[in-house]
Amino acid sequence: MRVLLQRCYEASVSMEDEVISEIAGGLCLLVGFTHTDTPETVDYMAKKIVGLRIFEDESEKMNISLAERGGAILSVSQFTLYADVSRGKRPSFTKSAPGEKAEALYDLFNQKLAEAGFIVETGVFGAMMDVKIVNHGPVTIMLDSEEMRK
């Protein structure tokens, strides 16, 4: 499981020029799954994300988590996080989980974030969307469950 996390002032998802989800501040998460991901992977990543200390304290050090600070989450499915560009000019997405599995894991991930007490807005799984993010910092962090569990 990969999550591209961005601390944001605001973020929104639109389809056909209509905003379908938006948050005023917190985290925007672009979320991708691979074949080996499980519900346990999802649980681990959800807990990791809500506990990450990526907001500044009064000393301007990243020392405050979203759980401590408050804020919302915009979660957007993003199978292209598993793009393989090692050969040729066209990306391959064979490392991405099949749609049915990825959608179930994505729904579970969003449920875990909501159970942790956050407002969770989402995109539409598998749809073409326009995502607007006003990144704060900018702070952008790539989380990879395989790398984190080594």
Curated annotation (Swiss-Prot):
One of its GO terms (cellular component) is cytoplasm. The keyword Metal-binding does not apply. Its EC number is 3.1.1.96. Pfam families: Tyr_Deacylase. A motif (Gly-cisPro motif, important for rejection of L-amino acids) lies at residues 137-138. It is an enzyme of class 3 (hydrolase). It comes from the Bacteria. It catalyses: glycyl-tRNA(Ala) + H2O = tRNA(Ala) + glycine + H(+); a D-aminoacyl-tRNA + H2O = a tRNA + a D-alpha-amino acid + H(+). GO terms for biological process: D-amino acid catabolic process; tRNA metabolic process. One of its GO terms (molecular function) is D-tyrosyl-tRNA(Tyr) deacylase activity. Keywords: Cytoplasm, Hydrolase, RNA-binding, tRNA-binding. Its main location: cytoplasm. InterPro entries: Daa-tRNA_deacyls_DTD, DTD-like_sf. It is found in: Cytoplasm. An aminoacyl-tRNA editing enzyme that deacylates mischarged D-aminoacyl-tRNAs. Also deacylates mischarged glycyl-tRNA(Ala), protecting cells against glycine mischarging by AlaRS. Acts via tRNA-based rather than protein-based catalysis; rejects L-amino acids rather than detecting D-amino acids in the active site. By recycling D-aminoacyl-tRNA to D-amino acids and free tRNA molecules, this enzyme counteracts the toxicity associated with the formation of D-aminoacyl-tRNA entities in vivo and helps enforce protein L-homochirality. A Gly-cisPro motif from one monomer fits into the active site of the other monomer to allow specific chiral rejection of L-amino acids. Homodimer. Belongs to the DTD family. HAMAP family: Deacylase_Dtd. This is D-aminoacyl-tRNA deacylase. It comes from Listeria monocytogenes serovar 1/2a (strain ATCC BAA-679 / EGD-e).
